[in-house]
Amino acid sequence: MFAAMLICSVVFTSCEKDELEVQQNYPFELKVMPVPGEVKNGQTVEIRVTIERSGNFNDANYSIRYFQFDGQGTLRFHDELPYMPNDVYQLSTMQFRLYYTSQSTVSQSFDIWVSDNFGNEKQVSFQFSNKD
């Protein structure tokens, strides 16, 4: 009798919520294809990036920003204008290609950050030596 009452109380209290809880916040990882370690002035390097989500929520939005702290160069998405350092740009796909063009005769280093609209953020660092 006690077991039946316990089961009934668990069943009835578990159905108190009217709304179904849907997980929206899924962590993600960035996968980057290998890039050359050396670049010469004026050379463009393709950087292939994939956002790998641990779950799927259709309303998840992703953005990218970057900052170059050594050397000089530009980073752009496809045929768009070069990104401005620390400005945020929306990403429309989970797989994308960035193009870094060296404008320096010394070593170059920069970081990119990809964020979602739930506060998750991943950083990837790149470093290129000068190629004569």
What are these regions (language model features)?
Residues 1-2:
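Bacterial N-terminal signal peptides that target proteins for export
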Residues 8-32:
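Bacterial Sec-dependent N-terminal signal peptides
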Residues 24-132:
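First exposed extracellular module after export/assembly in secreted or surface-exposed proteins
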